[in-house]
């Protein structure tokens, strides 16, 4: 019997609505239920589309305004208010000339730091409520100029490190970038393993100063936030020459302090050391490992970059700097905190009037964020949850959940509506036709639109249905039928009623034959690389389409993506279908439980089979090392999976950590490691060497992947057995014995405190002199003794030592002590100027066989320091040389010394040279080019060149006559202001310049074209290469 309430009669519909809309997207009840809400339901509260952003305004900005953006989507359109530091801004016309609002955006004209810096928020409102934007901080940026005070020069010995201080001027914000200029703008110094600029302090660090570092340095500072750059006064860096560069241990000068960073950000840690040789820098995390794929090291180790920080990246980081003289370490703690981030946000919701509702939001962050709620822009409640009971119209409005910690504030916005409505199936009727398989299960859904929640009843035809062993009416109103048969076919009606009305909806049920698997897939056993086959046959209702779905261990096989290994065949007939799955070139990952599911639109059934895949073994586990000696270790491991084929043997491999070698098979005891073993001794190792080990298993089906490497292990120390090679030497300074060698490679140190013992003696002397060299990378030792006779034969041998003892001596080598420096000085016989910039000096050679060459030094008297003199080296076979690069009209002093490998002998007497005045600077002015009446010559004429007071007197003119495009031509000289030149066929250039005792002056050039035959050149004419290039 149909309930009385649902007999046909007039029905009253009453509707009252409140609504909740997310700020991130528009959600309108009226879009889904226009009949329920009518025209008014198209309205909704403000939803932010743009919010104001933090702004840094440059104090020197030419654009004298700041714009803060605020834009919402709302219906009706929202009105806008602005707050500064939580105080309402008066934005009426004429109230404050600095502020104006346009379409929600706040414009600040002629910004003033004292008035307009602070935190701004935008409030958007309409009839449905108000929402408040995130806070936007307005700050004023500046970067002052550097002080105009001169910077003091920095004097550093070559080989030592240097630090040039930047001392940036006052600025805001703190974020600056630094570079250094050398001598002039914009010559920025390149950064490399030896030079580093700290982006924290701006200081320039040079690990090892060289003579080429001499120059003037300026710190160049840029503020990206305000697009401004300034640079300091230049700092002179003066390297002080050392006869031999000393070595200095690594000394870390750039040390990143303990620092804080936010989750997801990138951070860079700095570390740079002074020292000679240039230190090597390495990084490690002391309480963990450097994050794989999220870290990078640059600038030869000076910078450690950590990307997309996670909380587990917090910890203690250490940089190590070392060279052959020593090591240094620095530790810094990195703390990772997080700005608020939503774990759960308030969501859109429609709630029945009088009902209960919980509005909840959860935020993560470090420190833990404080959470509170706003309603229509005002404080509503603290905590992460608001509980409503017996909702009423007064609960309507715009709600915001706000999470805040010291790193930021986030908002989640929503609009609340509560509604009341009679039941309606207009937009969600009962499914009109439902199919069910015999002996199966079906569910009719009944979900009318109604508030308060309606009472639900069901009928079949005119029969009212009740819960039984086969029939269930769920709490949500759905009707479930179990173990169905043909007698269950028919029409089913859902009735819904609440205090505002009633409604019903009807659907029909039809019964089909059940689907059955008649041939299930069979178990299979294959080896890796072989093929496997699974077959499945099913019967089904002829009126329904059947599909087969294959899955492996519960996961559907993607036949398109895995087409390399999976192929499927299907056959269909009336009421029966089959499917065959072919697995080609099987791999270990293909093993498992395969399921065939036969499925129609009404029902499905499944059958399964196991596929076993046998293959090479997996990697051994837990590789570790014990019983370490100087040349052996014991390696232990645990068996990995044998992949259903017994392990026959193990192979142990090793590599040296420092050498970054490829893995190689290790020599073991026993030589052949059986498949049931879990340890082996690795032999023939080098002492005091760091190794890694790994193990590989093999069975009859192949060799498996290697294990993870063992922890790095260093063998014990032992006495060295390798001596230095290529022992030689000789030469050097007087009264010295210079010994050279090729150092022992580091893998043969065999222990700490490695060095060399050198034994040497005159060839026929029975007494050996022994010295110790503690630098393992040293290649030379110079023994100084005033008693050493020159050019004497010495016998030398060497051996290595370490903390465990001394090694064997090398074979003896024979070298000679240094010869004496020349004892006599050359005698200068002539020193005279050739031009304004060149001179010649001639001397009487020193008649000693030990002279190898001569050094000529010259410098400007009373102007240049003798130490800065220009130097020319000349072979001992020469007794004269040409001096160039001299200054015109200047007094020079010149001296000559004989020298050899032992040094320089005494200087000759000093001679004076006075260079000529400069050649004429003005070129001749060519005034005419006239063809001779015969056509065989041409006359070139020019004005006389007058010398200036500081220039040499003109003695004549030089004329170069050459074919265009040729590097040489015919040179003429004349004292006149004109010259006749033979006319030749083709295009020619004529170059004219004045000549004086100071040299040749500036050139004038004219181009001529002739048609006469080109005569042969007279033998008396001189061919010269092209030297003049100036064209007037």
Swiss-Prot record:
PANTHER family: CONTACTIN-1, PROTEIN SIDEKICK. Residues 1-31 form the signal peptide. Mediates cell surface interactions during nervous system development. This is Contactin-1a. Glycans are attached at residues 119, 216, 266, 455, 467, 483, 504, 604, 879, 950. PROSITE patterns: FN3 (PS50853), IG_LIKE (PS50835). Expressed in brain. Keywords: Cell adhesion, Cell membrane, Disulfide bond, Glycoprotein, GPI-anchor, Immunoglobulin domain, Lipoprotein, Membrane, Repeat, Signal. One of its GO terms (biological process) is cell-cell adhesion. Pfam families: fn3, I-set, ig, Ig_3. Belongs to the immunoglobulin superfamily. Contactin family. The gene is cntn1a. Residues 619-718, 723-820, 825-918, 920-1015 form the Fibronectin type-III domain. Residues 46-139, 144-231, 249-335, 340-417, 423-510, 515-612 form the Ig-like C2-type domain. Its main location: membrane. It is a lipid-anchor; GPI-anchor. GO terms for cellular component: axon; plasma membrane; side of membrane. It comes from Danio rerio (Zebrafish). A lipid is attached at residue 1010 (GPI-anchor amidated glycine). It is found in: Cell membrane. One of its GO terms (molecular function) is cell-cell adhesion mediator activity. SMART domains: FN3, IG, IGc2.
């Amino acid at each position: 019997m149909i309930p009385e309430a649902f007999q046909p009669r007039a029905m009253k519909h009453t509707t009252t609505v409140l609504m909740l809309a997310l700020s991130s997207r528009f959600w309108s009840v009226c879009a889904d239920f226009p009949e329920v809400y009518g025209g008014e339901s198209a309205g909704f509260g403000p939803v932010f589309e743009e919010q104001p952003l933090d702004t840094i305004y440059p104090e020197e900005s030419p654009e004298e305004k700041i714009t803060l953006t605020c834009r919402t989507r709302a219906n009706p359109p929202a009105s806008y208010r602005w707050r500064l530091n939580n105080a309402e801004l008066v934005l009426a016309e004429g109230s404050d000339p600095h502020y104006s609002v346009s379409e929600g955006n706040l414009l600040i004209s002629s910004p003033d730091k004292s008035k307009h810096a602070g935190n701004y928020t935008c409030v958007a409102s309409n009839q449905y409520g108000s929402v408040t934007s995130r806070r936007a901080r307005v700050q004023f940026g500046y970067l002052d100029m550097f002080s105009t005070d001169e910077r003091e020069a920095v004097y550093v010995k070559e080989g030592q490190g240097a630090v040039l201080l930047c001392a940036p001027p006052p600025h805001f914000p703190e974020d600056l970038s630094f570079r250094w200029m050398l001598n002039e703008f914009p010559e920025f110094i390149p950064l490399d393993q030896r030079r580093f600029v700290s982006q924290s302090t701006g200081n320039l660090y040079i690990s090892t100063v060289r003579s080429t570092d001499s120059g003037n340095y300026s710190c160049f500072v840029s503020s990206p936030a305000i697009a401004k750059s300034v640079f300091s006064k230049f700092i002179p860096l003066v390297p002080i020459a050392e006869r031999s560069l000393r070595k200095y241990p690594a000394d870390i000068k750039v040390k990143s302090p303990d620092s804080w960073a936010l989750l997801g950000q990138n951070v860079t840690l700095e570390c740079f050391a002074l020292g000679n040789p240039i230190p090597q820098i390495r990084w490690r995390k002391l309480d963990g490992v450097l994050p794989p794929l999220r870290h990078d090291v640059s600038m030869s180790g000076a910078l450690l970059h950590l990307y997309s920080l996670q909380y587990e990246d917090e910890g203690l980081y250490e940089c190590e700097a070392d060279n052959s003289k020593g090591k240094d370490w620095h530790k810094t703690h990195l703390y990772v905190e997080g700005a608020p981030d939503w774990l759960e946000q308030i969501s859109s919701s429609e709630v029945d009037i009088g009902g209960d509702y919980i509005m909840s939001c959860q935020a993560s962050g470090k420190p833990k964020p404080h959470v509170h709620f706003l309603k229509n822009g005002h404080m509503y409640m603290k905590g992460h949850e608001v509980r409503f009971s017996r909702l009423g119209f007064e609960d309507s409005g715009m709600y915001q959940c706000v999470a805040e910690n010291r790193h930021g504030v986030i908002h989640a916005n929503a609009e609340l509506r509560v509604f009341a409505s009679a039941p309606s199936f207009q937009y969600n009727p009962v499914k009109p036709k439902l199919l069910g398989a015999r002996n199966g299960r079906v569910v009719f859904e009944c979900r009318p639109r109604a508030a308060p929640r309606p009472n639900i009843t069901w009928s079949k035809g005119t029969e009212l249905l009740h819960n039984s062993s086969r029939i269930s009416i769920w709490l949500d109103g759905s009707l479930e039928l179990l173990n169905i048969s043909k007698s269950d076919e028919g029409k089913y009606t859902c009735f819904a009623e609440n205090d505002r009305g009633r409604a019903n909806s009807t659907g029909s049920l039809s019964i089909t034959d059940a689907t059955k698997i008649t041939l299930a897939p069979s178990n299979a056993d294959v080896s890796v690389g072989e093929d496997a086959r699974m077959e499945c046959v099913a019967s089904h209702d002829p009126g329904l389409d059947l599909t087969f779905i294959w899955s492996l261990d519960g996961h559907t096989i993607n036949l398109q993506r895995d087409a390399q290994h999976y192929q499927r065949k299907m056959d269909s007939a009336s009421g029966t279908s089959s499917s065959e799955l072919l697995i080609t070139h099987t791999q270990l990952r293909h093993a498992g439980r395969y399921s065939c599911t036969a499925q129609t639109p009404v029902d499905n059934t499944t059958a399964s089979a196991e596929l076993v895949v046998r293959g090479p073994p997996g990697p051994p586990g837990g590789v570790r090392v014990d019983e370490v000696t100087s040349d052996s270790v014991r390696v232990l491991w645990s068996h990995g999976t044998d992949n259903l084929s017994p392990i026959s043997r193990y192979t142990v491999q090793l590599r040296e950590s420092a050498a970054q070698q490829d893995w190689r098979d290790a020599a073991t005891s026993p030589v052949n490691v059986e498949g049931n073993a879990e340890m082996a001794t690795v032999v023939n190792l080098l002492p005091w060497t760091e190794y890694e080990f790994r193990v590989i298993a093999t069975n009859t089906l192949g060799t498996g992947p290697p294990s993870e490497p063992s922890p790095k292990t260093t063998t014990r120390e032992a006495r060295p057995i390798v001596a230095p090679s290529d022992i030689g030497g000789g030469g050097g300074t007087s009264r010295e014995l210079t010994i050279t060698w090729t150092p022992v490679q580091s893998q043969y140190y065999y222990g700490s405190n490695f060095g060399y013992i050198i034994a040497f003696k005159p060839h026929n002397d029975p007494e050996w002199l022994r010295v110790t060299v503690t630098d393992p990378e040293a290649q030379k030792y110079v023994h100084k003794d005033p008693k050493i006779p020159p050019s004497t034969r010495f016998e030398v041998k060497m051996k290595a030592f370490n903390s465990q003892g001394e090694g064997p001596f090398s074979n003896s080598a024979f070298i000679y002590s240094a010869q004496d420096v020349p004892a006599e000085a050359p005698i200068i016989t002539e020193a005279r100027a050739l031009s304004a910039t060149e001179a010649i000096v001639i001397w009487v050679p020193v008649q000693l066989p030990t002279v190898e060459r001569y050094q000529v030094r010259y410098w400007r008297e009373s102007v240049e320091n003798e130490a800065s003199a220009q130097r020319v080296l000349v072979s001992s076979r020469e007794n004269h040389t040409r001096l160039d690069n001299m200054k015109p009209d200047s007094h020079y002093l010149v001296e000559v010394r004989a020298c050899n490998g032992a040094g320089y002998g005494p200087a000759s007497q000093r001679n004076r040279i006075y260079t000529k005045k400069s050649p004429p600077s003005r070129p001749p002015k060519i005034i005419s080019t006239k063809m001779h009446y015969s056509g065989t010559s041409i006359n070139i004429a020019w004005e006389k060149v007058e010398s200036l007071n500081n220039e040499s007197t003109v003695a004549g003119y030089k004329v170069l006559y050459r074919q265009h495009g040729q590097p040489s031509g015919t040179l003429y000289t004349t004292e006149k202001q004109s010259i006749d030149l033979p006319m030749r066929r083709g295009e020619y250039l004529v170059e004219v310049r004045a000549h004086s005792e100071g040299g040749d002056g500036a050139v004038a050039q004219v181009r001529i074209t002739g048609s006469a035959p080109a005569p042969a050149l007279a033998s008396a004419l001189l061919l010269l290469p092209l030297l003049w290039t100036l064209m007037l």
